[in-house]
């Protein structure tokens, strides 16, 4: 195992436009970190810099407390798993897994021992003589992981390894990756655009946006206390409801853009002169009686089996509430909703940052 450290790392291809703005990250021995964000946010570029496939514009990278910023990929003690498997079609599973060791001059017996052990861990033993074309997508991805495992790297790097698999197989492979990490305990940096992968695999999540690490924290921290409007809107399915507005002069109510007032449990007069955004997750909205709740005109109801999603309008803006599977109001009806004060989030609309009490 090894630690991984990124110190003030930046990347720009033209010397003017930053692709990666200053990133600082400390990954502990054996930690599993997931970088998540939309396409083009810089997560794969950052991973490639750790691998040595891209040069940093500034800053340094350390693996096991050794500066590797200028080292070639082969000298960094890393192994990378790609989304397209990158298997040699004319080679057997055994030879694909062994190839990297052969070109590094390992002996036949050492190669056999390492490949056999990786095949046992990944349940590939019956497939070692097959060619990649004879394997399923999930089996090919396990071979790609096996090729990384036999190198016994200090750090595993994963670049969207499950993106080419169908939904059912992605679930299976997520479980296998969790089990693999528990067994090997190798420091891992994983890139995905899929927030479900991020939340289920990570010990800590890095939410990337336009080359910036918007938030670094545990899955629970990122979900329960998003640091910015971007994190609030990106993490969660469906996303957090967000309502533009402002706080009244006395600080006792949040006023939506169309004048609807929502009483605040704790007065916040210090926020009265700011443009704010209120957020609440769909599962935290509760149905209540008309005397206590705010009315929502129901537009559509999504039946998901375990629960239902009610889509409507409130305060002139769209809102989604997660209801139990037993609650099935008709489209066009009016629901009365309660927004518990403890479940409310507030953000500065101009900076996008979370407001702290």
Regions found by a protein language model. Give the residues of each.
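Conserved ABC transporter NBD signature motif
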Residues: 59-67
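ABC ATPase nucleotide-binding domain
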Residues: 5, 26, 62, 336-338
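The feature captures the beta-strand-to-loop junction immediately N-terminal to the Walker
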Residues: 36-38
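Helix-to-loop junction immediately C-terminal to a conserved catalytic motif
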Residues: 51
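Conserved coupling/switch loops of ABC nucleotide-binding domains, chiefly the family-specific signature
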Residues: 57-60, 110, 210, 244, ...
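Non-catalytic connector elements of ABC transporters
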Residues: 238-241, 249-357
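ABC ATPase nucleotide-binding domains
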Residues: 73-230
């Amino acid at each position: 195992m090894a630690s991984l450290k990124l110190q003030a790392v930046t990347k720009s291809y033209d010397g003017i436009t930053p692709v990666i703005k200053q990133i600082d990250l400390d990954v502990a021995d054996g930690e599993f970190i997931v970088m998540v964000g939309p396409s083009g946010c810089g997560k794969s570029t950052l991973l490639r810099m750790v691998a040595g496939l891209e040069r940093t514009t500034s800053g340094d990278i350390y693996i096991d407390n050794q500066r590797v910023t200028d080292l070639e990929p082969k000298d960094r003690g890393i192994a990378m798993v790609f989304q397209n498997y990158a298997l040699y079609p004319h080679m057997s599973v055994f030879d694909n897994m062994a190839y990297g060791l052969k070109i590094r001059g390992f002996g036949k017996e050492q190669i056999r021992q390492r490949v056999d052990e990786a095949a046992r861990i990944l349940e590939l033993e019956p497939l070692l003589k097959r060619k990649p074309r004879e394997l399923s997508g999930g089996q090919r991805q396990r071979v790609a992981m096996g090729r990384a495992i036999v190198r016994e790297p200090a750090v595993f790097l994963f670049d969207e390894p499950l993106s080419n698999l169908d939904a059912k197989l992605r679930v299976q492979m997520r479980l296998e990756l969790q089990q693999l990490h528990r067994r090997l305990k190798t420091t891992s940096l994983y890139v995905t655009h899929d927030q479900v992968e991020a939340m289920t695999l990570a010990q800590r999540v890095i939410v990337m946006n336009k080359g910036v690490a918007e938030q670094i924290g545990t899955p629970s921290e990122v979900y329960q206390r998003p640091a910015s409007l971007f994190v609030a809107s990106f993490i969660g399915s469906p996303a957090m409801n967000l309502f533009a507005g402002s706080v009244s002069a006395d600080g006792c109510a949040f006023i939506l853009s169309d004048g609807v007032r929502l009483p605040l449990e704790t007065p916040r007069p210090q926020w009265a002169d700011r443009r704010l955004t209120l957020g609440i997750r769909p599962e935290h909205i509760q149905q209540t009686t008309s005397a206590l709740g705010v009315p929502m005109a129901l537009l559509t109801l999504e039946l998901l089996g375990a629960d239902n999603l009610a889509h409507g309008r409130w305060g002139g803006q769209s809102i989604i509430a997660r209801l139990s599977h037993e609650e099935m109001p008709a489209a066009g009806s009016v629901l009365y909703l309660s927004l518990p004060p403890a479940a409310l989030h507030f953000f500065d609309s101009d900076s996008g940052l979370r407001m702290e009490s």
